[in-house]
C-alpha cells in the first residue's frame, strides 16, 4: 500500500508521486506517516521532509507551510521547497556562512528575528544535502 504525496509551493509542484512513508517536520515535532494514517491537518515547520520511495530515502528542504493528511493522500503546501538532490552543496554552504555572519551582526529585535529565520532556512538546505539515507 502506498501514499500519494503532493508538495506544492505558490509557484510550482515540487513533488507528485506515490511513496511508502514520510517523516515530516511540524511545529510540534516530527511525525511519521504510513498508509492508513489518521486524518490530520498540521503546520509544517522549516525543516527536512524525508521520503521513502522504492526502498530509498530521499530528502526535501521545506520552508514552512501546512500539511493535510487523510485517505492515503498527503498534500503539503509550503512557502518554498527544494529536493536535497537539487541543492548545490557549495552554494548552500556559502549561504549558510553568510546567514551566520548576518545573525552575529544583527542589531535590534526585527533584524535578529529575520537573521534567525534566514539562518534556519540555510541550515535546513545544508541538512537536506547531508542527511544519510
UniProtKB/Swiss-Prot annotation:
Give the keywords, sorted. ATP synthesis, CF(1), Chloroplast, Hydrogen ion transport, Ion transport, Membrane, Plastid, Thylakoid, Transport
The GO terms this record gives for MF are:
ATP binding; proton-transporting ATP synthase activity, rotational mechanism
> Which Gene3D superfamilies does the entry mention?
6.10.140.480, F0F1 ATP synthase delta/epsilon subunit, N-terminal
Q: Where in the cell is it found?
A: Plastid, Chloroplast thylakoid membrane
Cellular component (GO) terms are:
chloroplast thylakoid membrane; proton-transporting ATP synthase complex
Q: How does it sit in the membrane?
A: Peripheral membrane protein
Pfam families, per database record: ATP-synt_DE (PF00401), ATP-synt_DE_N (PF02823)
Role noted for this protein: Produces ATP from ADP in the presence of a proton gradient across the membrane.
Q: To which protein family does this belong?
A: Belongs to the ATPase epsilon chain family.
NCBIfam families, alphabetized: ATP_synt_epsi
How this chain assembles, per its entry, is: F-type ATPases have 2 components, CF(1) - the catalytic core - and CF(0) - the membrane proton channel. CF(1) has five subunits: alpha(3), beta(3), gamma(1), delta(1), epsilon(1). CF(0) has three main subunits: a, b and c.
Name the chain's protein.
Answer: ATP synthase epsilon chain, chloroplastic
